[in-house]
Amino acid sequence: MGRQKELVTRCGEMLHIRYRLLRQALAECLGTLILVMFGCGSVAQVVLSRGTHGGFLTINLAFGFAVTLGILVAGQVSGAHLNPAVTFAMCFLAREPWIKLPVYTLAQTLGAFLGAGIIFGLYYDAIWAFANNQLIVSGPNGTAGIFATYPSGHLDMVNGFFDQFIGTASLIVCVLAIVDPNNNPVPRGLEAFTVGLVVLVIGTSMGFNSGYAVNPARDFGPRLFTAIAGWGSEVFTTGRHWWWVPIASPLLGSIAGVFVYQLMIGCHLEPPPPSTDEENVKLSQVKHKE
């Protein structure tokens, strides 16, 4: 047992990456993979069973808990943004260096791509059987919507852009409130569950129009995977070339969320007073001369 533990320790030391930004990128990749794997897995189960194994609520619950699990996995290493819109907001507020925006975005998109690939492999036979050995993007037998978001038939481009803008702005406002130490800070360890609850609320209130991507990586990574896996370039042209909306609109919504929170809440908060308990501890450590 002692030798095994020593071997595990040595292997850990050998595999340890000393470049901090690379460690953080790997964490973002894995966290986003978990988000997409569980989230899109729930969509696959509903679509491929034609609604007999879940529905709109189960999809939203799965995405909410998937975000929670992704944050729990990656949070200690990278902060678990799992979303370029969140990273953009943090860089815009100077809470993270701008170099993290392209690095995190690439890692998050890769994680989403891999998560989609896992679900494709998991439901491979069911996907092919669903539409008689065809990979169809949209319609009654469409399966591309398992992985990326597409607009409902009633939705035009302007309304869809506004949909993603408001959804992302709402997400950013809530995330900033959750992580703001001068506001009502969430008890340590519960941040992941609270952010997951925010995603659940957004999904159940704003998910009808286009599936509330509010995350460029979560949408583009799986969309790119479907284009490569056999659905083809139609995944980029369907919905009047909808693909760019879940990328551009969330980034603009992120800026709006930052401005709304800072102008209406953040700029008016005062730092909390020093803790009396901490002062007592410090005073108790003072040595008095007798």
UniProtKB/Swiss-Prot annotation:
It is found in: Cell membrane; Basolateral cell membrane. A motif (NPA 1) lies at residues 83-85. Its main location: membrane. A motif (NPA 2) lies at residues 215-217. GO terms for molecular function: glycerol channel activity; polyol transmembrane transporter activity; water channel activity. GO terms for cellular component: basolateral plasma membrane; plasma membrane. The record marks 63, 212, 218 as: Selectivity filter. Keywords: Cell membrane, Glycoprotein, Membrane, Repeat, Transmembrane, Transmembrane helix, Transport. Belongs to the MIP/aquaporin (TC 1.A.8) family. Homotetramer; each monomer provides an independent glycerol/water pore. Could also exist in other oligomeric states. This is Aquaporin-3. It comes from Sus scrofa (Pig). The lineage of its organism: Eukaryota, Metazoa, Chordata, Craniata, Vertebrata.
